[in-house]
């Protein structure tokens, strides 16, 4: 398995691998209205060039891995727009193509940059539900149903040339198990799995992280694991817990230091000082994090700050 692991060569040479940050935040800054169940996947349909620009900005900021704009891109989601599975898979493949084109553009500017990766985003079934389920994990499907949901996107991402998969924002143990088993049908595929949490020791659905790690230890295609899309202040304790459970590289890409007001549906600074991702870098590294980036509300400036501190 190790010879097909795209992370290994990079992590053998450097302490951390920088991921990118939020896609949606940057698209909104460019005038996109993402008030839609498809979220940033909507832009794959309407204005894909903007996605390439965002990827390029993150590479320029220091990211070594772009995560595709396919988190909410599924045939089930696109069906509401009247697209069939073939059309949906073509759009999912487009998300990889856009990231690859951004990589090509950055390498043309910086031929000495070295290896850059493209990770295909595989968001959870809860993201398709578009009701916050990815932060609760309180949904239930059979293994077959979960795999039927994920299979077309996994195939499209791999066929389009993603270097690995980012199976991310996963809140549900049964879905994690189904997705890990699905990967065995694609033996050359490699993935990281990252989770949303109820607390530092439990998945959002309440499953102990110890049980999740034990499950994934049986799937060598999973080459890193960790956490994403959680509050910045909750990251270190969770990483410390995971570090005691696995020898795999740990992944962390939390939300910005802002806090979300569910009533007004707006983000706000908390107190006089809003913590930044880079403030946490030393403690994340001490807790075993090797793949580090940002999720909601983070920007190329956040990745540049991580780069400056690393």
From Swiss-Prot:
Is Ion transport among this UniProt entry's keywords? no
Q: Which GO terms describe its molecular function?
A: S-adenosylmethionine-homocysteine S-methyltransferase activity; S-methylmethionine-homocysteine S-methyltransferase activity; zinc ion binding
Q: Which residues form the Hcy-binding domain?
A: 1-310
Describe the reaction catalysed, as an equation.
S-methyl-L-methionine + L-homocysteine = 2 L-methionine + H(+)
What cofactor does this chain's UniProt record say it requires?
Zn(2+)
E.C. number(s) listed in UniProt = 2.1.1.10
Q: Which UniProt keywords apply?
A: Amino-acid biosynthesis, Metal-binding, Methionine biosynthesis, Methyltransferase, S-adenosyl-L-methionine, Transferase, Zinc
Top-level taxonomic group = Bacteria
What does the record give as the function of this protein?
Answer: Catalyzes methyl transfer from S-methylmethionine or S-adenosylmethionine (less efficient) to homocysteine, selenohomocysteine and less efficiently selenocysteine.
Subunit architecture:
Monomer.
What name goes with this protein? Homocysteine S-methyltransferase
